């Protein structure tokens, strides 16, 4: 029997691969393996906790240079003294807030996830974008829809 969901996931994985969005490719392939094995019983947990675990791992990656000392504390302190750094802080706050709205939208309206992924893949492949867009795109969409 034809599995449309599997076909869509394989199509998105191929599209991601050819647009050099390896993180999405790997994520989709892992989900395909989970779907096709007894591990599929972990989907309720993944659906409930996946975003939280992913954000924890992302936060660890972002904070690692501070923890390791690659970014010295003196550099962090100077961030509060220069207009460019203050602007960067303000933008960081805005983008974090936007990403939070995106997580909420993606959790409450999963029908938008496919469109956000396809838009990100097109942005990466055709416009030399960077594949960090789905959460921010969802946040912008939530502003447009008035959700969150």
Curated annotation (Swiss-Prot):
Q: Where in the cell is it found?
A: Cell membrane
How this chain sits in the membrane, per its record, is: Multi-pass membrane protein
The primary site where this protein sits is membrane
User: Does Membrane show up as a keyword for this record?
Assistant: yes
Q: Which UniProt keywords apply?
A: Cell membrane, Membrane, Transmembrane, Transmembrane helix
Write down any Gene Ontology CC term: plasma membrane
Cite the Pfam families for this sequence. DUF441
**What's the protein here called?**
UPF0756 membrane protein ETA_17460
**Signal sequence interval, chain numbering:** none
Kindly indicate whether the keyword Transmembrane helix belongs to this entry.
Answer: yes
Q: Where are the transmembrane segments?
A: 14-34, 51-71, 80-100, 112-132
Organism the protein comes from: Erwinia tasmaniensis (strain DSM 17950 / CFBP 7177 / CIP 109463 / NCPPB 4357 / Et1/99)
Q: Which domain of life is it from?
A: Bacteria
* Sequence similarity: Belongs to the UPF0756 family.
Under InterPro entries, the record lists: UPF0756_TM (IPR007382)
